[in-house]
Amino acid sequence: MTMGMNRRTLLMGGGAAGLTLWAGGASAAPFVSRRIDVTVRGNGRDVVLIPGLASGPGIWSGLVAALPGYRFHLIHVRGFAGLAAQANQSGALISPLADEIARYITAAGLKRPAVIGHSMGGTLALKLGLSGRAGRVMVVDMLPAGAAMVGGTASGLGFLADQLSSYLTGTAAGRRYLAQIVAQTPGAKNSDPDVIANALRDLANIDLGPQLPRLTVPLHVVFAVGSDAQQAAAITRRFREAYAGAKGALLKPIGPSGHMVMADQPARFLALWRMFLAG
């Protein structure tokens, strides 16, 4: 596994953080969490938006503004894009985050909302769909197995990821290297290197593919392809094979685009959002 700046590696995502508020009714108690903050915007059907690794909710700003008639719940993971890490500083990350978002859904009184997740957020969205918390799920440019995004498997890459995480967070040289990566990655400059390393470790050890047959909610998968036809065909085949276990899943390539499809192809991505939310 290389630590280069390939846009399709696990170290992806960007965007500015927005102001994080609880926007419930006047009698509602604030949602307090040491793992996430939530911004609520708009009125209408509920949609939960989860950004990717080292990203803030700002990645969704243009889309949220273009889609009135929905109440968007923008998740901001602590440790990413300017928020202090707090409970995300050490230990497992992905499963606790999924549990915390599920707790928010319950606390806010949401009834099986639509959930859209980009990159790492797509993994969290899938977990919420599998747990019955989401009414429908859109995954943006993420495979069921995080390691597969760099051509590995959870069994093969997981051990390496454990060692890599220890190196990046437990040695002076590793921390310097991770700091350099963070400094060079758009959207990650204000993210905590420890949280990024923990997220990479968790993602490399997660494979939700075997659980897809028990997913009972509608699933849309949007993925980025480049301008090279042969490469686009290979990526499309890879995604279709990875999601074959999800009966009725709708897969849509979008391109030419890099990993941040909402920025590279905003009009086409907005059209896919409309189709997903109208279902």
Predicted regions located by residue number:
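Active-site loop/oxyanion-hole signature of alpha/beta-hydrolase fold enzymes
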Residues: 73-113
